[in-house]
Amino acid sequence: MAKAEYKSAIRSRRMIQHALVELLQEKELDKITVTDIVTRADINRGTFYAHYADISGVLDSIMENVCQTIREALEKQPLWAKAPDARIVLQHLQRMLESDPEFYRNAIRTNV
């Protein structure tokens, strides 16, 4: 049961993040409400607040996911390397972007 709940939480957070990125393509951040996000994500407000305190928390989560992907790519470099091999980092970033191109395309286009 706990594993299913964990998957459900991941799914809910992903839906919230995607909804926010989509909405940012339509209107300014300060015009987006939690109601807009939950309507777009097709979840209830309780689900939103179970995962995030506010909209800025969703933005922080999106950025943390991107930063974590970059950190993981850098950590794969040998400790003795003076500088990370840019090719490996770029390949990892490419895989990340290809995993969900629409999401990252919208996130990159967004001026937040």
Region locations from a protein language model:
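N-terminal intrinsically disordered/low-complexity leader segments
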Residues: 1-9
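Alpha-helical structural segments
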Residues: 11-22, 26, 40, 57-77, ...
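Residues in the helix-turn-helix
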Residues: 15, 47-49, 103
